[in-house]
Amino acid sequence: MTRIRPVLATMAALAVTAGITVLPALTPAASASASVPNCGGTSLARGFFSGLPMRVPTVANGHPAQWGCNLPPGSSGAAVARLQIDLNACYNAGLQVDGSYGPLTEGAVKKVQRSEHVTVDGEYGPQTASHGFQYSLSGSGQGGGCDYITTP
């Protein structure tokens, strides 16, 4: 009988270890946007086809490697204004460039997402940015054409 206790203790320890290993897999995954920082500025990136510089929303000003950021509805600032310029220049959105991500900006982003066959959630984020979103090659969005971003 004394041999059974060590065996039971070992089995219990293995069960606990297995439970600890399995439990994280059973917990709900965090949303993709929760792990991605919000856009807070703009930076220069290169156009995929043209090789020309273009301004894109990024985590902070001057950080082109951090272009994979989120701009959810309700955001405001330079990154939103940049998004509105691009939506107007490349998708004829007709938005007022006011730096406020309201219902009209959200609707314009949804329209682009539908046309590019990505998840339609109205939020500009890494998926929208890297799957067909075009950016204006002109600083003001007036002329100059549009291009896709070159991944940094």
Model-derived regions, located:
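Exposed boundary/loop context
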Residues: 12-15, 40, 55, 92, ...
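Short, surface-exposed, charged/polar-biased interaction segments
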Residues: 25-29, 64, 104-108, 130, ...
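Secretory targeting and sorting signals
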Residues: 1-33
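Short acidic, glycine/serine/threonine-rich helix-capping segments at coil-helix boundaries
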Residues: 70-81, 88-132
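Short, intrinsically disordered, charge-biased short linear motifs at domain edges
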Residues: 20-30, 54-56, 127-135
